[in-house]
Amino acid sequence: MATERDGGGCLRVAVSIFSIYYWLSALGHVFLGLWMLLDPKRNYILDLVHFSENDPLLKASAYVSLVCGCAQLLVGFLGLCGAVNRSRFLLLAFVMFLIGTFLADVAMGTLSLFYKDKFSNNYMGVYLKNLTYNRYSRDRWVLPLMDTIQFYVYSVKENVREIVKSKYGVMTSEPENKMVTEFIDKLQFYEKCCGSLGPTDYISSRWSQSTNQDSEEIESPLFPVSCCTQITGASALNPLAKSYARCQQIGANRQWRHAVGCSERLMSWFNEQIWIFVGFGFGSALTMMLGICLSCCLISKIRIYHVIRDDY
C-alpha cells in the first residue's frame, strides 16, 4: 500500500514563493534588530528608556525583531518543505509559527507607537525627575546612565543646554566630563547640529570661559570645531572645519557652521527610529496574514490517497 498526495497545484507554488519571501523577511528582521542595537548613532536612544522600572522597554522591540528574524530563518524551511511534499503537518506547523510571527510584529509596532506617545512632550521629563529622585542612589547602574543621558532627551531641552554650558570641554581629565564632551562632539558631527537650542548655547559657557583663559591666540574660539561644516575625510574624533575662521564668526551662515540645535535633531532622530519599527512591524504583520491564508487554503486542498497495488 502506497500513500499519494495531490491537490493545490497553484497554491503550492504560491506558498513556496511566500516561504522564500519569508526568509528575506527574516534577514530584514535580523538586520533591523542588529542595526538598532549596534549602530552607535542609534543605540543610545534605546538605552534612553532602559531605566523604566514598571513598563516594557523600547529596547525590547529591537530584541523582538532580532529573535523573530533568527526563528524565521528556520521556520521558512517548514513552509517550503510542507508545500513541496504536500505535508499537512509541516504546513500546520508553519501556520502556527506565522501566527506567532504575526503577533510579534504587531507587538513590535504597537510597542513603538506606545513609546512615541509616552516620551513626547514633558513625559520624559517626568521620567527623568522620578528616576533622579527615587533611584539615583539606589541602583548602581542608574548613576552613570543618568549622568550621560540627560542631554539625550529632546523634551528636556534646558537640561541639554545646561550640560553644554557647564560640562562640555571643561575638566576633561574627569571621566564624566570627558565622556560628555566626546558624546556631544559626535552628536554635533553626525547630526550636523550645534549646542542644544543653537550655537549661542556656547557663548558664556564654561568651555568658552576656559578657552578665553587658556588660549594664547588673539581671539579665542567661540564654538567647538564639531559645530563647523566639515571637509571630506573628517571624523567625529578628528573634526576638520571647512573654514575654521568663518565658522567662528558670530553671524556665520550654514555654509560654515551648523545652525540647528541638537535637541531638534534628536527629536527627528527619535521619531525616525519609531516609524521604522512601526512600518516594518505592521507591514510584516500584513504579509504574515497573507501567508497564513495561503497555507490554510493549501492544507484544505491537499488530498491523501492510500493506493493498494496488486503485484502479479
From Swiss-Prot:
Its main location: membrane. It is found in: Cell membrane; Cell projection, Dendrite; Cell projection, Axon. PROSITE patterns: TM4_1. It is a multi-pass membrane protein. One of its GO terms (cellular component) is plasma membrane. The keyword Nucleus does not apply. Keywords: Cell membrane, Cell projection, Membrane, Transmembrane, Transmembrane helix. Expressed in dopaminergic neurons, head muscles, vulva and spermatheca. Protects dopaminergic neurons against oxidative stress-induced neurodegeneration. May act partly via dopamine receptor dop-2 to negatively regulate dopamine reuptake transporter dat-1 activity. Also plays a role in modulating behaviors linked to dopamine signaling. Confers protection against oxidative stress in the whole body. Changing G109E: In gt1681; in larvae, enhances neurodegeneration of dopaminergic neurons induced by the oxidative stress agent 6-hydroxydopamine (6-OHDA). Pfam families: Tetraspanin (PF00335). This is Tetraspanin-17. InterPro entries: Tetraspanin/Peripherin (IPR018499), Tetraspanin_animals (IPR000301), Tetraspanin_CS (IPR018503), Tetraspanin_EC2_sf (IPR008952). GO terms for biological process: cellular response to paraquat; negative regulation of response to oxidative stress; regulation of dopamine uptake involved in synaptic transmission. GO terms for molecular function: D2 dopamine receptor binding. Changing G109R: In vc2026; enhances neurodegeneration of dopaminergic neurons induced by the oxidative stress agent 6-hydroxydopamine (6-OHDA). Belongs to the tetraspanin (TM4SF) family. The chain crosses the membrane at residues 17-37, 64-84, 89-109, 274-294.
